[in-house]
UniProtKB/Swiss-Prot annotation:
Key words of the record: Amino-acid biosynthesis, ATP-binding, Cytoplasm, Glycosyltransferase, Histidine biosynthesis, Magnesium, Metal-binding, Nucleotide-binding, Transferase
Enzyme kind, highest EC tier: transferase
Name of this chain's protein: ATP phosphoribosyltransferase
Gene behind the chain: hisG
Keyword Heme tagged: no
Activity regulation info: Feedback inhibited by histidine.
Any one biological process term the GO annotation gives: L-histidine biosynthetic process
């Protein structure tokens, strides 16, 4: 029996979001053993329980108030939301924040030897998918009627097996589609992982813990998107050097021992520093350019 005074978080047990969710919680300072194949894991240093479940169960657990928070792909969340609305329900939850992992796209794909001129060419076609409600929402907006073929796996083999004329499935590189004689023709939904919270009153202690986790998640995500930059630069070209680092705060300037013509610059940049930028910095006279990852960050 779960202790309802503890914060309950649902995450994917295995699959596309599992490793990234585990890493995010660990970097937020939650000490928990997720190596054992258990449904529930308990944090050692915080009043938090982690429920490890199938990804398509997570939205329902949050909407039904079984857990307090869930880490889930927006595609799965939106599909469950549309499913419940189609059944006359009024599902409620809050999206606390979009996360920086789990990026994917839900796309239409057709056999390589068939022409595609737009969604209208799918009129009255049979389309295999694991996301019937997202597919229907998209094609309804295009005034296209279709026949749905619901599959929970191996959707890409449907046309070759004679089960469907086209498919609607998640795509990353497109290699799986190509291996099955298909090509991506239309992106209908773009998704990332997100953190959601159940509706209803939250005890003050739990809400304080949620707020703390959100602050830490912001720090983790911001740190992953930022770099700590150190370099030496000519004193007379400081502003030119700074202008090449968009997103950077004003740098810390330190004198160099025995060299009054140059200074050391330290700064945090929220932008990716590409090789081209480093080469431009060097052309301005910068040297000893170091770009370092940031583990944690709090403004």
């Amino acid at each position: 029996m779960l202790d309802k005074t503890r914060l309950r978080i649902a995450m994917q047990k295995s699959g596309r979001l599992s490793d990234d969710s585990r890493e995010l919680l660990a970097r937020c300072g939650i000490k928990i053993n997720l190596q054992q194949q258990r449904l529930i894991a308990f944090a050692e240093n915080m009043p938090i329980d982690i429920l490890r479940v199938r990804d398509d169960d997570i939205p329902g657990l949050v909407m039904d108030g079984v857990v307090d928070l869930g880490i889930i792909g927006e595609n799965v969340l939106e599909e469950e939301l549309l499913n419940r609305r189609a059944q006359g329900e009024d599902p409620r939850y809050f999206t606390l924040r979009r996360l920086d992992f789990g990026g994917c796209r839900l796309s239409l794909a057709m056999p390589l030897d068939e022409d595609y001129t737009g969604p209208e060419c799918l009129q009255n076609k049979r389309i295999a998918t694991s996301y019937p409600h997202l597919l229907k929402q998209y094609l309804d907006r295009k005034s296209v009627s279709f026949k749905s073929c619901l599959l929970n796996g191996s959707v890409e083999v449907a046309p070759r097996a004679g089960l469907a004329d086209a498919i609607c499935d998640l795509v990353s590189t497109g290699a799986t589609l190509e291996a099955n004689g298909l090509r991506e023709v239309e992106v209908i939904y773009r998704s990332k992982a997100c953190l959601i919270q159940r509706d209803g009153e939250m005890p003050a202690e739990k809400q304080q813990l949620i707020d703390k986790l959100l602050t830490r998640m912001q720090g983790v995500i911001q740190a992953r998107e930022s770099k700590y930059i150190m370099l030496h630069a000519p004193s007379e070209r400081l502003e030119e050097v700074i202008s090449l680092l968009p997103g950077a705060e004003r740098p810390t300037i330190l004198p160099l021992a025995g060299d009054q013509s140059r200074v050391a610059m330290h700064m945090v940049s929220s932008e990716t520093l590409f090789w081209e930028t480093m080469e431009k910095l060097k052309s301005l006279g910068a040297s000893s350019i170091l770009v370092l990852p940031i583990e944690k960050m709090m403004e």
